[in-house]
């Protein structure tokens, strides 16, 4: 019996180790997230654990966010607002790239913000549908508590103060994944990743509904 238990334990460790190596390989070569980097004037990256958000200047003490991070307490984004001598009410709009929990956790901290996204993503966010990726499907359906206040059309342009944001529907990572073009920067969320070589690669297959579809955009 003892030998059987040892054998089962070794098998479990092998499976877990192989799974970990597989996931690690999916992220190999990704460029690091540089907190505080500014890819364009009026655009600042904020690192929140293993993900990032972007703060976009909208003029007159107003900002918009691309995504809202993985921390429900929003420590990183609140610190960035404080650095600008702004409070939560300065956030007038949040543009969500998709509905996975690591990109929308702090939305509730900004009650004055309009929340933008595509209708195809709403079922994932309200729990009527679950993620479909090979790994994330095991997380099951979950109501994030986040709702869009404005549903976008593909190619729509939105104005927030002095900022204009053009929205594109790019299904693949999730059914309603979005890309946003603002201040000359294209924000792709998890639909693509920057590499150490200065190129981009497609969505990570393990967490994507349809990584082949994501590569078509």
Task: Kindly give the residue locations of the regions a language model identified.
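Conserved beta-strand hairpin/beta-sheet module of binuclear metal-dependent hydrolase folds
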Residues: 32-84, 179-191
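Active-site neighborhood of phospho(di)ester-bond hydrolases with catalytic His/Asp-centered motifs
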Residues: 66-68, 90-102, 116-118, 169-172, ...
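N-terminal Sec-pathway targeting helices
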Residues: 1-16
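Membrane-interface motif at the C-terminal end of an N-terminal transmembrane signal
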Residues: 15-32
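Metallo-beta-lactamase
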Residues: 164-171, 175-217
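Active-site HxH/HxHxD metal-binding segment of metal-dependent hydrolases
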Residues: 72-75, 82-153
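Cytochrome P450 C-terminal beta-domain/meander region
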Residues: 151-164
């Amino acid at each position: 019996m003892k030998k059987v238990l040892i054998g089962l334990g070794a098998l479990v460790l092998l499976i877990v180790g192989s799974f970990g190596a597989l996931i690690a390989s999916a992220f190999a070569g990704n460029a690091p997230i540089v907190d505080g980097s500014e890819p364009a004037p009026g655009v600042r990256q904020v690192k929140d654990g293993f993900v990032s958000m972007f703060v976009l200047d909208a003029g007159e003490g107003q900002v918009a966010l691309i995504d809202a991070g993985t921390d429900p307490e929003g420590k990183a984004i609140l610190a960035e607002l404080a650095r600008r001598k702004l409070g939560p009410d300065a956030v007038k709009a949040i543009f969500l790239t998709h509905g996975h929990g690591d990109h929308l956790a702090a939305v509730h901290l900004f009650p004055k913000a309009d929340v933008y996204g595509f209708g195809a993503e709403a079922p994932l966010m309200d729990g009527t549908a679950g993620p479909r990726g090979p790994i994330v499907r095991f997380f099951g359906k979950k109501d994030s508590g986040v709702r869009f206040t404005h549903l976008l059309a593909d190619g729509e342009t939105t104005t927030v103060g002095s900022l204009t944001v053009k929205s594109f529907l790019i299904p693949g990572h999730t059914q309603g994944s979005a890309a946003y073009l603002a201040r000359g920067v294209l924000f792709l969320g998890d639909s693509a990743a920057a590499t150490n070589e200065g190129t981009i690669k497609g969505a990570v297959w393990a967490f994507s509904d349809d990584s082949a579809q994501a590569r078509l955009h």
